[in-house]
Amino acid sequence: MIEKDMPEVSLLDMALMIEQELDELDMAKVEAELAQLSAQLEDYLAGSSSEFGGNKGQPWQGVLDCFYQQWQFTGDWQQFFDYQNTQVSQGILNRKGTPLTLGVLLVHFLRQSGLTAHGICFPGHFLVRLDIDETFHYIDPFNGASLSWQQMELKLRGAKGDLARLKQQDLKPDDIKSIIKRLLHTKKGALLRDHQFNQALRCSDILLRLAPGDPFEVRDRGFIFHELDCFNVAVDDFNYFIDKCPNDPSIGLLKLKIEQMDHSQTVMH
């Protein structure tokens, strides 16, 4: 069970476990590519790789150079919202993705190299923090660029509005569970845009296994059931949310949808 294994596995392993459940992932192919990349990185950092040549910089700079220059991992602007770009496994095979999928991979390779790296679920983006000699370095995994405070604040304002100001709490590292939930929400959003409601429902079910009874997850599952014309369970989910969060701004919309579904069921009978 994913939720039981979470304390014992790495971020990358957990992401791949979820994709194996959602997408019937060919793990042998992915693991073979991952093992090859790991071996290449070890050789590159040791300066003994005939393919890459030596590296005399700092280890973390070597990892970034190998990741972005040698392997040519890159952010996919053109198909940013495609479901494939939410798949870490496809990132390994195709060497492109979103800030989140590339960030999961970058954290993995940095940690594999003995470095202290963390993922940050930044508003509208995903960042990687490197801890070097009691100094924090922030990396944009979409392109490997180091980010200044001003650059990160611009990203924050792009996500939250021009009045937003960057605070230290915005840069706190997130745990595996938080990052996996962000990944699942991203997957679910891509599937909903593609009208893949059954697979989106599977994402929702995993999210509720990670946060049992969470009213917002239950409400969102209700919207998916509504799209699938499963009105009885959609009504149950909406009523659960209304009971748990009676002052939420979405209550009016939910009550309207419940009335519409009740009417539809009456007409069908």
State each model region's role.
Residues 1-269:
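A structural boundary/capping signal
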